[in-house]
């Protein structure tokens, strides 16, 4: 069974992330969205809420599971029996970091391959950072995130 692990902070999960998950769900038997705690990134949403939002966005995909984690990614992949890391590349600027990450993961978990997918053109410019900035300034984010995520962002920035 091919099990792919799609790691990220997902703060918040965007339509770009969703696009990659949908496509991965057609390519792999089982997709694990691995939501990283990432305390050094100081996420807007707590881990539990990011996991819940990702579950809501992907609930229509029967072979997709969402799990939060706070361990080393290589260890988490082994625990989950994953044999592939899925990473998205929006632009050439993403490549250098992702290349370093793939090489480090290969050293830590040589049995897990790294696979890169590019998002659909209509989502290639979306990032969680931009979505948070637009939401914080009261902009319309409905084109970039699932309605439940837009609602959570709107609620978060009301405070």
Swiss-Prot record:
It is found in: Cytoplasm. GO terms for cellular component: cytoplasm. GO terms for biological process: coenzyme A biosynthetic process. It catalyses: (R)-4'-phosphopantetheine + ATP + H(+) = 3'-dephospho-CoA + diphosphate. Its main location: cytoplasm. GO terms for molecular function: ATP binding; pantetheine-phosphate adenylyltransferase activity. ATP binds at residues 9-10, 17, 88-90, 98, 123-129. Substrate binds at residues 9, 41, 73, 87. Keywords: ATP-binding, Coenzyme A biosynthesis, Cytoplasm, Magnesium, Nucleotide-binding, Nucleotidyltransferase, Transferase. It holds the Pfam family CTP_transf_like. Its EC number is 2.7.7.3. Its cofactor is Mg(2+). Pathway: Cofactor biosynthesis; coenzyme A biosynthesis; CoA from (R)-pantothenate: step 4/5. Reversibly transfers an adenylyl group from ATP to 4'-phosphopantetheine, yielding dephospho-CoA (dPCoA) and pyrophosphate. PANTHER family: PHOSPHOPANTETHEINE ADENYLYLTRANSFERASE. Homohexamer. Belongs to the bacterial CoaD family. This is Phosphopantetheine adenylyltransferase. The gene is coaD.
């Amino acid at each position: 069974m091919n099990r792919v692990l799609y790691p990220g902070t997902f703060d918040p999960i965007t339509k770009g992330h969703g696009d990659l998950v949908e496509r991965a769900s057609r390519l792999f038997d089982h997709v694990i969205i691995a939501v990283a705690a990432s305390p050094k990134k100081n996420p807007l949403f707590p881990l539990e809420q990011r996991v819940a939002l990702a579950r809501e966005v992907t609930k229509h995909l029967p072979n997709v599971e969402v799990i939060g984690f706070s361990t080393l990614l290589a260890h988490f992949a082994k625990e989950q029996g994953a044999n592939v890391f899925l990473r998205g590349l929006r632009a050439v600027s993403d490549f250098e970091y992702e290349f370093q990450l793939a090489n480090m993961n290969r050293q830590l978990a040589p049995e897990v391959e790294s696979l890169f997918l590019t998002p659909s053109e209509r989502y290639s410019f979306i990032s969680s950072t931009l979505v948070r900035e637009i939401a914080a300034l009261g902009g319309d984010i409905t084109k970039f995130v699932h309605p439940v995520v837009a609602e959570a962002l709107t609620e978060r920035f009301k405070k």
